[in-house]
Design a protein with these regions (language model features):
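Metal-dependent nucleic-acid phosphoesterase active-site entry motif
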Residues: 1-23
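Ca2+-coordinating acidic residues in Ca2+-binding motifs
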Residues: 123
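Generic structural "secondary-structure junction" signal
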Residues: 17-21, 48, 100-102, 126
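PIN-domain endoribonuclease scaffold, especially VapC-family toxins
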Residues: 2-8, 27-97, 107, 111-115, ...
Length: 140
């Protein structure tokens, strides 16, 4: 059995599911967070996207922010040098289209050397790490 990844980047879908009990992936998200031994990394672009989707539930938004504040995630932000790559990715995948949060996730994966993501987004089956390698989705 291959070793479990030590760190991966979490997209908004699992975060939304974790804090929305009506979400299709809610149970999976709870199980995922309980069982994960990896360092969960994300970015404010992903948090912003999750907060927008959860906008109708103040308790869900509060719980998400409290969880992040308590160390549920490690936040890593794009550096100025990442923005050129983010724009390249948005242009490359314009036919999907690729949103800003996904482009940030891919750019951060590339900079940090991470090939594992946690996402419900089917586009991560299309996106390529450094243009070549498929991402390994540890969520679905």
């Amino acid at each position: 059995m291959p070793d479990a990844p030590r760190k991966f980047i979490v997209d908004s879908g699992p975060l939304i599911a974790l804090f929305d009990a009506d979400d299709h992936y809610h149970r999976r998200a709870l199980e995922f967070v309980r069982q994960s031994r990896a360092k969960l990394i994300s970015t404010m672009a992903v948090i912003t996207e999750a907060m927008y989707v959860l906008e109708d539930s103040l308790p869900a938004r509060r719980n998400l922010l409290t969880w992040v504040q308590s160390g549920g995630l490690t936040l890593t932000e794009p550096e100025l040098d990442d923005f050129e790559r983010i724009m390249e990715l948005i242009e490359k995948y314009a036919d999907l289209p690729m949103d800003f949060a996904d482009a940030v996730v891919v750019a951060l994966c590339e900079r940090l050397g991470i090939t594992h993501v946690a996402s419900v987004d089917r586009h991560f089956a299309i996106y390529r790490y450094k243009g070549r390698t498929k991402f390994i989705n540890v969520f679905i």
